Amino acid sequence: MADELTPMQRQYLALKREIPPGAILMFRLGDFYEMFGEDAVVASPILGATLSHRGSQPMCGVPHHALNSYLAKLIRAGKTAALCDQVEDPKTARGLVRREIT
């Protein structure tokens, strides 16, 4: 199964293991914070975000410029969120953009 994952998906899963169980990982991908898998299923109705799929993987996303309002919705719903930001410029990154929990 791990061989079927893209480098970005492997990066996401590695970062997901760094946060407390049950926390929703908001993963910066370009102009959006994306949520995948169970995080997307849980977060999409709270955030009013459309649940879609990339392959068989559930996902939803919110625009990065509106992050504070979406974080407030998760917190009001009693959820914990972890932010994962791009820590290098995607235009100059060689290969996968480095990301860290911030």
Predicted regions and their residues:
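Basic, polar low-complexity surface loops/patches
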Residues: 1-102
